[in-house]
């Protein structure tokens, strides 16, 4: 079926170029970060864990690059890696919350980081609608194939049975793609917002670094936020390279296994390997140097699964067309559809699990963020916080799984206490 929509879909991470161009000189961060690691044991521990986890994800992605594709197992490894890193950032920020509150600039940095999660709510709602449409298409196919397989011969002649089955298969084909304009518009919006936020993070980090070089908490929090973001985009770039440029992904995987010191030096080494492999494709290198928030990886992994699902839907539609040509070809065509339906069902389920992980991550972070912002504002309810709470409630209210989850109950409790505090 292909892309029948007018919206251009994101295919790679080169959209980060504009943000990268705003900050041309990125050489200061690794050295500054290494000095902070030497002075702060906790940051050094984080550095070691980050490198180990990111290296494992890069190796998993690069293991299948010869076929220019990603296994679901490697996607799970990458997503798990980036979710773990993001949760560690949340922990460090909350541990240092009082010091963060005392520094307005540092507080703004952390606030920008957390508010980036809010932009994904509309996208997740659009994804949920698309998954429901995909499951409806799956049900149409399943019923058509079941009737053909189980209906007694006496109930209808073979030709009538085939005609009935083909009618239902045409119904599936007429339904079109489950991923509509709304879905791709939401994807593009969130992707652009995340990349814009990355530029703000980097500019603010540099400004504050000049003013607060001697402040230990700032160096710890800003270093962890930046390096986590940096590692996230590095892994994202390997995911993109696994499909578009397998030799690049292989070179990165080889470089990831080299013992070169701290994560700062390790990532710098990977960047050099990447630059050599691309033979001067500075656009991609610049995009990698920007660093990014975890949501970009969430979106990129979902995009890969969506595109994979669209290929399967298109393939099944081709099987339907083949079955329409000749009644004798119907049986073979239906057998082909059965095989593809199994892959289709698995892809829908995997995509649903990916979306659930995103939702649960947000359910876990937002209650903590509510208290963090509320306390920092002296128990005052800001307009953005109020909008965030309403948006979150709208999402949760539509999904029975959220209503019964401890994440949702925690958020309800958090919201109630916030309302009481500002009443």
Swiss-Prot record:
Residues 1-14 have a biased composition (Basic residues). One of its GO terms (cellular component) is membrane. It is a multi-pass membrane protein. The keyword Coiled coil does not apply. It is found in: Membrane. Residues 1-37 are annotated as: Disordered. The chain crosses the membrane at residues 224-244, 247-267. It holds the Pfam family DUF677. Keywords: Membrane, Transmembrane, Transmembrane helix. PANTHER family: UPF0496 PROTEIN 3-RELATED (PTHR31113), UPF0496 PROTEIN 5-RELATED (PTHR31113:SF21). Belongs to the UPF0496 family. This is Putative UPF0496 protein 5. It comes from Oryza sativa subsp. japonica (Rice). The lineage of its organism: Eukaryota, Viridiplantae, Streptophyta, Embryophyta, Tracheophyta.
